[in-house]
Amino acid sequence: MTTYLEFIQQNEERDGVRFSWNVWPSSRLEATRMVVPVAALFTPLKERPDLPPIQYEPVLCSRTTCRAVLNPLCQVDYRAKLWACNFCYQRNQFPPSYAGISELNQPAELLPQFSSIEYVVLRGPQMPLIFLYVVDTCMEDEDLQALKESMQMSLSLLPPTALVGLITFGRMVQVHELGCEGISKSYVFRGTKDLSAKQLQEMLGLSKVPLTQATRGPQVQQPPPSNRFLQPVQKIDMNLTDLLGELQRDPWPVPQGKRPLRSSGVALSIAVGLLECTFPNTGARIMMFIGGPATQGPGMVVGDELKTPIRSWHDIDKDNAKYVKKGTKHFEALANRAATTGHVIDIYACALDQTGLLEMKCCPNLTGGYMVMGDSFNTSLFKQTFQRVFTKDMHGQFKMGFGGTLEIKTSREIKISGAIGPCVSLNSKGPCVSENEIGTGGTCQWKICGLSPTTTLAIYFEVVNQHNAPIPQGGRGAIQFVTQYQHSSGQRRIRVTTIARNWADAQTQIQNIAASFDQEAAAILMARLAIYRAETEEGPDVLRWLDRQLIRLCQKFGEYHKDDPSSFRFSETFSLYPQFMFHLRRSSFLQVFNNSPDESSYYRHHFMRQDLTQSLIMIQPILYAYSFSGPPEPVLLDSSSILADRILLMDTFFQILIYHGETIAQWRKSGYQDMPEYENFRHLLQAPVDDAQEILHSRFPMPRYIDTEHGGSQARFLLSKVNPSQTHNNMYAWGQESGAPILTDDVSLQVFMDHLKKLAVSSAA
């Protein structure tokens, strides 16, 4: 008999799905009392090396309001060649190509191990991938030089048929013609005036022919012809490499005490318009590189006077940030236009000060693009991260999908409340759409323009079955996820995942439901909900909401005697959940103090798209200890783990930190590691460095690497994350002998848990 933990892990590996509850309450009323909604973390392109795509198209249910895909949950009559849809119970005839099927000769999509299956759509033209580079030239020469080298490197990684384009900007915006032999030719636009797609089309003389051809369908086998601004790599590789090499810093003089005039808003608008006119609904990536904030034209985020700093959270709270609303509105409009045509927007921002990610965040957030933040383009952090964008799978194809749509079908007892993640609504109202919206709701279809193997959406459901309509014994609720996307090879593909879970009556079988709780998935699903709310609500209100939900969950599933906090017990399936909430409350996702608006936007962007494992690390970092007393071991994220004779390695997802305890740091300063008789000390120092390198080499985006020691200024990164079980207030308590006191007034996990138990068992609650 598999345990729930094994069941959860198998489902994640096979289908890329993690549910908050793996047995569902059978009525609407009982489901609302569960506190945590029935919800799933779904990774549409979860890597499955053992799942080769099938070279035929899926069989669909014939009922027009259903159109579910044939799957292992359907009942099949092999003699009559009929199958019954498990969602609407419609009986369907198999197509003629299935004439040879039998119990012994089943098609792959009916086998239980293929609850997830990928089909290749063979009709229609194969489209080339498109990469449009949009480059800020208002930066220091060494930064620009490093960026040019990174872009030249990326050209060598693109498939020869990929189309590329180049737009550069500073005070003006230049759209470069790439078809010219021997001469550099570009169209120059003022950086203060926005242009519509129609105006751009007329000014650049873009033909409308490709647009109409591309949408006409299967009879046009040729891909739309390239134009002067977007050319195949194989044709202009040398020209573009030279052109990038010749790029100069923006020539306009910058007076003393002023910022350079930077037209990021117009440059991105022209990039979106160019692709809109020429290649709608084709996989395309706008890669925007910025070295500072937009200081003129639509989308500007700060004036050009250096004495006026860019907005802080304090300015925004006090309504003292005059460009935020207007700038955000401009970029939101561009993000929605790009999402409508299926194009991805990446933003690579490298500067010591803020660059305006707060206003621009919707561009990558709504289109599934990447957001990368660094100090300079001339750092390994940017160079390595950018190189990883072009990582290939074992078949030599990019690990990226384009122009995706996700459609969800549900059995009649359950409806879809909404999704939170890098997607936009396709406003497809169907019978399985709930009226209660969570996140992006009111639809059963979403557009995900950019997909990677780790892109993960949080999907929230509502049980709608009435209390007085019991579900038959052994009944199961089913959900089907249908993801259509353009593979990086140019093929259209459809990945179908169909899952089912048992129903249980919450009044008589509450133990079954409680035992099926996935506390890790639930923590991430509730965290996404909290961060989604934090975008529009006051910080303290979100924390209060999170606390209320946690108290209610403890009251519902804890075991206790009324008004006796010491009697409170949580079963193993719930025991880690309060700890996750404690760390979430203290995290940079909900606490903006000490973070700039750009940093908060960056952290939230990554949390809203990463898979469960990475998201858990972001909420509760992992801490490993290295010492002479044994092999490396995971230790509690607690101040008591900081010992003088230990080295700690902390992984927060965004940072990899190595901390040397006081004694170790003194030995290192004395140079013991260089003496042959202390070789074991040299090995001890090297062990965490080797482990850190392993993480640094594989993660996207590459984390910041910090090497620090007891008393070092960067030790603050560790001290701010650990649970402050010892502080300056209790460090002299009797019997206290280990660990480092933290100078903070934050409550510790122990105090948090004591308060939680007190509130959960209170009869006044």
Curated annotation (Swiss-Prot):
GO molecular function per UniProt: GTPase activator activity; zinc ion binding
Outcome following mutation: F628A: Decreased interaction with MIA3
One BP annotation, GO: COPII-coated vesicle cargo loading
Record's subcellular location: Cytoplasmic vesicle, COPII-coated vesicle membrane; Endoplasmic reticulum membrane; Cytoplasm, Cytosol
UniProt keyword Ion transport, yes or no: no
Effect of substituting F681A: Decreased interaction with MIA3
Domain writeup: The Gelsolin-like repeat mediates interaction with proteins containing PPP motifs that include MIA2, MIA3 but also SEC31A. These interactions are probably competitive.
Protein name: Protein transport protein Sec23A
Species of the source: Homo sapiens
Lineage, highest ranks first: Eukaryota, Metazoa, Chordata, Craniata, Vertebrata
